[in-house]
Amino acid sequence: MCGIIGILGKRCVTSSLVESLKRLEYRGYDSSGIATVHNGRLYRIRAEGKLVHLEEKLQKTPLKGNLGIGHTRWATHGVAVERNAHPHVTERLAIVHNGIIENFVELQKELIEDGYTFETETDTEVIAHLITRALKSGLSPQEAIRTSWKRLQGAFAIVVIFEGEDNLMIAARSGPPLAIGYGKDEFFVGSDAIALAPFVDSISYMEDGDWAVLTREDITIYDVDNQPVKRPLTPLFEGALLASKGNHRHFMHKEMFEQPEVISHNLAHYLDLGNYTVRSFQKLIDWKKINRILFASCGTAYYSTLVARYWFESFAALSVDNDVASEFRYREPPINSDVLSVFVSQSGETADTLASLRYCREYGVKTATIVNVEQSTMAREADFVLPTRAGPEIGVASTKAFTCQLATLAAMALDAAKQRGFLAEQAEHQFVQQLAEVPRILNEVLKLDNKIEQICRNLVNVKGVLYLGRGTSYPIALEGALKLKELSYIHAEGYAAGELKHGPIALVDEAIPVIVVAPYDRWFEKTCSNMQEVAARNGRIILITDKKGAEAVHLDILSTIVLPNIPEFIAPIIYALPIQLIAYHTAVLLGTDVDQPRNLAKSVTVE
């Protein structure tokens, strides 16, 4: 999985396919490949590793054809070797795929019983054989795609070309994004605008459930009900390759909705989702030699490390210190060889965090950095780099980078526990399965977008907001308060729920809403007691909980945001999304500049 490109034109498409794949490298990959149709025949070349290896093969064996597809893959099902690289080819078609097919084992068994042979370990090959079987039954390519699509469970975006069809490409989207590009005498399909920017004049974004039939003469998009639809065209120019909001009003909204996909990319990097195990960090970090972790970060990244503290201490029995990077150097903490210092930053350029990293390096301490920009200064200077793979984040208020930081830290904590002998095999499978469910659950939460917008109408005229959380929900409450401050300019404070009676309760009245982050976990009953205290003082409560929590609360609640029931381990990642949506919609209702809030910068490069 990772990046998709398809081109249908009147000239050889090979060089444009490779150029587009280069523009998708930021998404991360471990193999690549392209396939073309020339004189009705399918041709394919794939390579393990970087794109330069694919280019070397193409120099030796050039591919012809004015119709082709390309792919950069991060291994999910199947190891990172050439045979598992995309495109996958049968005697009837070539296909590229982004996503995960959840029922591929069941479908694979069915196809094997039907006489099909599998050459790879990937879930994508199941799609290829399903469509091929449908074609052999006499269905048209369009009918074969639709019939096969109905059998698939999971999230996927696919682009397919066919043997014997020099003028046909079909794309389908169920989850991961796909954009259609309109160039001069050429049509394109790609994972995002970045891949298409040099070649097209405008793009349209396929919506979830759409599928598209492309010929040189026309493009027809069908919706989930198989009805022809028109999707809005967005002008695109080279300088705006990062400046497309798609069908969203703001970059922040787009980036919140990208979280299911980018977290699936992240998890594929750190987890073996086929075997439900953690990919070992041992080549980077020998956890048996580590007795203490020191986190230093700023803002939202700092809150991600506060969540991680619970994970590392409870799973791996490691002592954890959390510091705001801007204060870290001033207290001169004692550090030695058994300490791992970890620095989290979206940009990898945050001045205070970078200065803290350099401080630790001066003392010979091992340094690891969790960054979204892999070419950043912090990535170059740290001993170990753990990329979040969230993709470009344009909105100043971090959303998808934050949840990808949490996902990275969760995998890191599981690996530490495993290496140190505190994580049994069965428990490892259980926790990895829980993480694997995160993209699906986030998609469910995104369906609450309109409801949350309505709830936020209660916040537009308030003088302040309190956020409460307990356990791993406490850092999420802190992040919620920060987001609301950043975007809406409403004063907001986050507190540990147990601290309410130690001062903040003095603020509680009808004018100060209290947003409570309270999944139904081992701390839920105690948090309910805090809500009782708020209700007794006529406080207005907005409760973010799950179905069990909503049923257990018998209070006069202003509004309740009900999420799916989920395990405690992954709750911080899931509950981050509704607090982002609250901040976003409140800011939109107030008319503030959501993507570029006043006085804030995406990358803080001064101390």
Curated annotation (Swiss-Prot):
Gene Ontology molecular function: carbohydrate derivative binding; glutamine-fructose-6-phosphate transaminase (isomerizing) activity
GO CC annotation: cytosol
Catalytic site: C2, K602
UniProt entry tagged with the keyword Cytoplasm: yes
Enzyme class (EC, first level): transferase
Any single Pfam family the record assigns to this protein: SIS
NCBIfam families: glmS, PRK00331.1
Role summary: Catalyzes the first step in hexosamine metabolism, converting fructose-6P into glucosamine-6P using glutamine as a nitrogen source.
Protein name: Glutamine--fructose-6-phosphate aminotransferase [isomerizing]
Originating organism: Bartonella henselae (strain ATCC 49882 / DSM 28221 / CCUG 30454 / Houston 1)
